[in-house]
Amino acid sequence: LRALGYQVTYVRNITDIDDKIIRRAHENHETIGALTARFIQAMNEDADRLGVLRPDHEPRATEHIGEIVAMIGSLMAKDYAYQAGNGDVYYSVSRFKGYGKLSGKHLDELRVGARVEMDESKREPLDFVLWKAAKPDEPSWDSPWGKGRPGWHIECSAMSTHCLGEHFDIHGGGMDLQFPHHENEIAQSEAATGQTFVNIWMHNGFVRVADEKMSKSLGNFFTVREVLARYRPEEIRYFILASHYRSPLSYSEENLQLARSELTRFYTALRGLPSMGEEKGVKGEGLGVRSNTSPLTPYASRFFSAMDDDFNTREAIAVLFDMVREINSHKSHEDIAKAAPLAAQLRKLAGIIGLLQGDPEAYLQGTADRFTAVVHVATGALVGGGANLKGTAEKVINVEEMIAQRNAAREAKNWAESDRIRDLLKANRIILEDGAHGTTWRRE
């Protein structure tokens, strides 16, 4: 959106008080504030590593009790809410005529299923809690209905309205939040303000493992941090963007390896070409970002068309691959004058979705310093001096030194030794590429 010139205010609210948080804090013998602060910090650290932009505002529910109480008060005054005999305050779902318009569900059908778990304190089985009466050993705040704490749904409405106003453009969240959470947000927000709550809802699909939804209860749950221990942040980001955000995301080692392989193709195409602005004629203007002064290039037009189609990053990446094919064609004919501007445009477009901003050499070699890069070799023979690596002991070799020794063997026309070094490195997932300007290497 920012690449299109829109001014974006990004809000990510945080529920820092609910039943699970209270229970976990008790189990850990720590304060709720300490528990939530620790998890919020970990979340932001992981998001930063994945290149997720920080929000402009990150409100926490406990910091907006005043706004929450005020919104509940408005609903009470308009007869959309009531206080039950147990002290809880509930939203009266039947009072809101548009209930179900987001999810397509109908009240009569919902009532049939809801009666099984009917709470005696409610007037109707679908009514949901806005304010929970205080319980012993739980945090609580003052309100016109007595001490208590907010329900989950009202927190989100109050915080988003506080930060963005009574009406805003885009609301996101997981597919599982569409009903009842987002349906309830619409009901309480529109009843309180009289305004349409949101223009566009964007619901992302679940992460699935072996065709099952990832969840703690199924035992197939893992954290971003655990995956980051095995894959680079850009590889994980690419893996996510290679699927449409509304589609299920199928997690597997095979799919992450595919993401690594495809990023390798991109960075191999960019390798040896100047970064944007490093060469005369390769500047920032006209590279494909929409503006009022320069027309879109054909590739940029296709890229933006894909992104305009419900944020179709999968199709946008397909456009970037078409650019790679043309870049490689120009490189094969040593036509750098054509390859370099196209590579600059590729970086510019990919940068819109947070990809291909790294150094190609660093990515392909898996290290920021190609001259000190090493590889662990378990079997085979080291070049030079007859050093033997046979056995189980793991040794470390310098890739650049081995390339130098291979070059010496080639100059001496010792092709057997040259091939042996190449094969040894290949066995350890190091691929050598001989070109007009010497030998380069990358990790397989």
Language model: regions and residue ranges:
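Structural preference for alpha-helix termini/caps and helix-kink/transition segments
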Residues: K213, T223-K283, G288-E444
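Hydrophobic face of alpha-helices
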Residues: G33-T36, I40, S157, I317, ...
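N-terminal, positively charged nucleic-acid-binding surface of large information/translation enzymes
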Residues: L1-G51, H437, W441
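Short, glycine/charge-rich beta-strand/loop segments that flank catalytic centers
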Residues: V11-D19, I40-M43, L53-I68, N86-R95
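The substrate-binding groove and active-site-proximal loops of carbohydrate-active enzymes
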Residues: A25-I32, D56-T62, G174
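Alpha-helical recognition segments enriched in aromatics with Gly/Pro capping
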Residues: L1-L4, T9, E45, G66-S275
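Short alpha-helical functional segments enriched in proximate histidine and acidic residues
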Residues: D46-R49, M71-S74, K78, Y82, ...
